From Swiss-Prot:
Enzyme class: transferase
Residues that, per the record, bind S-adenosyl-L-methionine: R46, G66, D87, M131
Name of this chain's protein: Ubiquinone biosynthesis O-methyltransferase
Organism field: Bordetella avium (strain 197N)
Pathway: Cofactor biosynthesis; ubiquinone biosynthesis
Similarity section: Belongs to the methyltransferase superfamily. UbiG/COQ3 family.
HAMAP family: UbiG
Disulphide bridges: none
Length: 241
């Protein structure tokens, strides 16, 4: 899918195949038993960790980069934040807006590249979240720099992505996509996974200081996700400007 917005921005940092992939699934964003079931399951954990480090979201201005259907955006808004969610998948944003109308949760959604928004609203957000997005774009460093530009001095930027090692290939691709079928086949590309050391270096180069990291684990027997110190597969990184 080439949207009007993406067609007018020929040099934006987007993988069209990735955009098409998520656009095709857009109608199922808010079905907790769909391909997005893992995101629904980990969302409370992500929100709790953000609040644990950054404090109350009440009255805070928050940007959710790569918001998709708005799962995290709505949760942060329900916690009292003034949330803007951005994504380039127009179909996902349409679903996010419709769900917001149904739930009564107010979130502003925009179809704009994070790099473009950084030139418009530099230093205007207390918190920026960029969850499960970096591994889906051609230039993750560009996204990190834009997130750093958008957050206020002293503000927080939270990332989550996948480590790159044999274990993450086995668990995140073979296990999650082919054996347990938690995700559609082809959701992830191993070469786009990012080591924590690489993300930390990118953050520092952008003026962000890594301030905490947690791993995300899944127990296939209990079907429960939890945060842990094991960052070998999925991990979250908190940084501060």
């Amino acid at each position: 899918m080439t949207t009007a917005n993406s067609a007018s921005r020929p040099n934006i940092n987007v993988d069209q195949a990735e955009l098409d992939k998520f656009s095709a699934l857009a109608a199922r964003w808010w079905d907790p038993e769909s391909e997005f079931k893992p995101l629904h399951a980990i969302n409370p954990l992500r929100l709790e960790w953000i609040q644990e480090l950054a404090g109350s979201l009440q009255g805070r201005r928050v940007l959710d980069v790569g918001c998709g259907g708005g799962i995290l955006s709505e949760a942060m808004a329900q916690a009292g934040a003034d949330v803007t969610g951005i994504d380039l998948a127009e179909k996902s944003l349409k679903i996010a807006r419709l769900h917001g109308l149904e739930s009564g949760v107010k979130v502003e959604y925009r179809a704009v590249p994070v790099e473009e928004l950084a030139t418009e609203q530099a230093g205007q957000y207390d918190i920026v979240t960029c969850m499960e997005m970096l591994e889906h774009v051609p230039d993750p460093n560009s996204v990190v720099r834009a997130c750093a530009a958008l957050v206020k001095p002293g503000g927080w930027v939270f990332f989550s992505t996948l480590n790159r090692n044999p274990k993450s290939f086995l668990f995140a691709i073979i296990g999650a996509e082919y054996v347990l079928r938690l995700l559609p086949r082809g959701t992830h590309s191993y070469e786009h996974f990012i080591k924590p050391s690489e993300l930390a270096a990118s953050a520092r180069q952008a003026g962000l200081e890594p301030s905490g990291m947690r791993g995300m684990e899944y127990n296939p027997i209990t079907q429960i996700y939890s945060l842990s110190g094991n960052t070998s597969v999925n991990y979250l990184m908190a940084t501060r400007k």
